[in-house]
């Protein structure tokens, strides 16, 4: 089993513990490969997964919300090519929003506007252009990894 398959297996195991009886599948809309947004069958839920540095991370929530999770190495010199001036925390937030939005990197990351939040229990809010906001949280992770979760309730 290659590393990608092993990470997928770990993420599915984590999700199965969170959502007993559910099954998970991914199918790329562009190439048909087993990657891309993970879909849930057998549970009224939505999920998001992310992988970095040998780790697999998973998040689950009610099906009615848009949910995105991203993990990034805390030092990533190549970020400047994708999101000029960004640090790993900024990138994880942007990527979580793009995952929650459902379009991923087909949207220019520069279109995501992130601001510190004032509501209690929320770390940040973000928008893609002038669209409805996503609520965001910075999540503790293992040493060397930053995690961010973005969610948006239905309109």
State what each model feature region is.
Residues 1-155:
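Core catalytic alpha/beta fold that binds nucleotide/phospho-ligands
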């Amino acid at each position: 089993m290659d590393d990608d398959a092993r990470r997928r297996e770990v993420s599915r195991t984590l999700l199965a513990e969170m959502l007993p009886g559910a099954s998970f599948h991914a199918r790329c809309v562009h190439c048909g490969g087993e990657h891309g947004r993970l879909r849930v069958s057998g549970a009224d839920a939505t999920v998001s997964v992310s992988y970095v540095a040998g780790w697999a991370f998973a998040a689950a929530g009610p099906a009615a919300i848009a949910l995105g999770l991203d993990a990034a190495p805390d030092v990533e010199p190549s970020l400047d090519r994708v999101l000029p001036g960004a640090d790993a925390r900024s990138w994880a937030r942007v990527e979580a929003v793009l995952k929650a939005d459902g379009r991923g990197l087909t949207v220019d990351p520069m279109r995501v506007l992130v601001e510190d939040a004032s509501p209690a229990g929320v770390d940040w809010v973000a928008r893609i252009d002038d669209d409805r906001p996503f609520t965001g949280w910075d999540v503790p992770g293992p040493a060397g990894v930053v995690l961010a979760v973005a969610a948006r309730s239905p309109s």
